[in-house]
Structure formats: structure tokens, C-alpha cells
Amino acid sequence: MTPVIQTEIAFKPCDLLNTRYEGWLADRLEINVEKRLLKLDLDMILEPFVNRPGKQWWAGEHVGKYLHAATHAWRFTQDERLASDMKSVVKRLIDTQLSNGYLGTYKESDQFRQGDGLNWDGPVWDVWTHKYNLIGLLSYYKTMRYEP
């Protein structure tokens, strides 16, 4: 059945790879790349994965957030330094994945369970880290056509 009233599509996504930014927005994008993404201590955000549970067992989402932001920034800038950093982070992150597929920061006794091993009996947010890892890795994969 055809609707009585035809709706018009109000939103059409733009082609971000072929969009050129100028002025204030272009300046902000460049500052974000130069002053944040290229300056971020990548060893620090990978440390909780390399040395589970790390200094802060709850701080694992930053790698995924970095990859998501850096991938989108790269789409605008095509900055090869950023591409190189992202490639390194992806490889290093994937290298920390356990044989059972686990890609988080918690020690084995706390993975997807209650408690944190430090006398805390409440829920742990292990899924939080995985969520952001997947968002970041999928953003990277889609844009950079990553093949393991």
C-alpha cells in the first residue's frame, strides 16, 4: 500500500572523504591531530592490555576511543604520521588478545564477572573496554581496509 503522504528525505550524508574543510573547523581538526592525537602516549593507553590489569584495571577503553577518533581525523587529513601510529596501535592491541578471544584489561579471575580482586564485590565493567575496542577497531578496519 502506498502512503497517502509521501515523505521527503531530510538528511543526506555527505561524502566525508571528498569534503574539504576551511576556516575555523579546519583549524580545529588540525589542532586535534597535532596537539592531541599525535602527542598521546600510546604506550600508556596500551599498558593495561600488555600488563593486565595495569595500573588502573578500569582504564581500557582509551585505546578504542583513540582509534575511533584518529580514524575519523585521518579521513579528513590523510596524515601519514597518524596512519602509522594507528597501524602500530592496532597491531599492538591485537597482539594482546588472549587465545580465548579476550581483549580486555582485567585479570583472568575478574573477566566478565563480579568483583575486581581488590575487595570490591560489585559489578565490573569489562564489557565497557570491549565495546570501545570494537568501535575503534571497526572504524579503523572500515576506513583503512585493514587485513590481519
Describe the function of each predicted region:
Residues M1-P148:
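Glycan-recognition and catalytic cores of secretory/periplasmic carbohydrate-active enzymes
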